[in-house]
Each structure stands twice: as C-alpha cells, then as structure tokens.
Amino acid sequence: MDYFHYPIDRDRETIAKMVKLFPTFCEKIDKGDFYIACAMGLHRTDIALCTYWVFYAADKGTVPPPIRGYRQENGHNTNKIMRVLNAFYQYMTERDGKEPMPIEVFKERKKVVNELSKL
C-alpha cells in the first residue's frame, strides 16, 4: 500500500500545500484502489473528496461524492467544506492571476455539495 499525506485545513499555508499536491491527489484517486482516512474524526475525508470533485472530477463528468460526516440529519452542516473550497478557489485565483473556473460554476458546484448533505 502506498502512503500519501494530503493535508486539509483552510489556513493559507495548508491551502498552498493542498494546491501543490492536488494533481498527485487526483492522480491517486483516478487510479482507484485508494483509502482515505481522517484519524481525528474531523470529517476531512468529505472535504478532500469535495475538493477533488469541485476542482477536477466534475469537469470529467464524475458524480459528486456522497457526504458522510457533514450530514444535516446528524446536526452538521457544510460550513467547513465551504471554507476550504473558498480558500482553495481564492488561492488558485491569486496564484494563477485568473479564476480556476467561472464563479457561477463554482457556486453551482458548492450548491450541489450543500444539497448532498441533506440526502
């Protein structure tokens, strides 16, 4: 089994690491036979998979990932996911001098993630 550490948080330093490692993260998911674990119970798996979908897999026609930790029925919401997605988008925009996708597309994808937390 191959080990790959993909950090998840919304602070600028971690977002920079996430963006840098993102192509490798996507490649590992695309190859299949992967396992994602968040040992702290902070539901970072949801955040990682939503980032993968919003910024990469949705463009390939992949269905969005199911939300397991941030479910409304369990008293949670998607605020943490949204904060990371927003920080990721902002960092990429600043780094590249252009938006990674049109803001309307980004908002629509975030809306899909929010809806998934209600299912």
Predicted features, each with a name:
Residues M1, Y89-L119:
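Cytosolic catalytic domains that perform sulfur/thiol-centered chemistry
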Residues A39:
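P-loop (Walker A) phosphate-binding loop of NTP-binding proteins
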Residues M1-I36, C50-A87:
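Cysteine-based protein phosphatase catalytic domain of the PTP/DSP
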Residues L42-I47:
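Glycine-rich nucleophile elbow surrounding the catalytic serine of serine-hydrolase chemistry
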